[in-house]
């Protein structure tokens, strides 16, 4: 049985019309365009009452999620367009290894008012520090 707090990877769907692709919309309360700058010191964040639904529009980055007491790397790229749904309560962060900002869309689902603590970095659990450092370094 899957937990309601599992990260999901969803295929992009839509309509190809000539040279243009029109993506099907995801249900959301707000749609945000964000830039993820090159990362020197990536950090984890955790939204208490918000589900993020992310897709890369330009560039690529590694999304790191902390789930079931394990760190997981999910590489998101513009040429492999997929949605990643990160439920509320799942710590996550981005590692942009390029020298350019990555542009993403976030189809946000709100489950209540935002909490100022959602935007404060969370510590990486001590037992996962070695794995965290390897992920930052780009080691598998």
Identify the role of each PLM range:
Residues 1-83, 99-140:
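Non-catalytic, conserved peripheral segments adjacent to functional cores
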Residues 94-97:
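Asparagine-centered strand-capping/turn motif at beta-strand->loop junctions
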């Amino acid at each position: 049985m899957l937990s309601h707090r599992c990260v999901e990877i969803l295929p992009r769907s839509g309509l190809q019309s000539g040279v243009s692709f029109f993506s099907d919309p995801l249900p959301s309360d707000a749609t945000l365009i964000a830039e993820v700058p090159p990362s020197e010191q990536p950090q984890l964040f955790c939204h208490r009452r918000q589900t993020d639904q992310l897709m890369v529009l330009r560039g690529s980055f590694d999304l790191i999620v902390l789930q079931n007491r394990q760190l997981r790397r999910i590489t998101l790229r513009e040429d492999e367009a997929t949605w990643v749904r990160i439920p509320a309560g799942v710590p996550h962060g981005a590692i942009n290894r390029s020298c350019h900002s990555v542009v993403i869309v976030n189809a946000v689902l709100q489950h209540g008012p935002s909490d100022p603590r959602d935007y404060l970095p969370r510590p990486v659990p001590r037992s996962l520090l070695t794995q965290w450092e390897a992920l930052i370094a780009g080691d598998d």
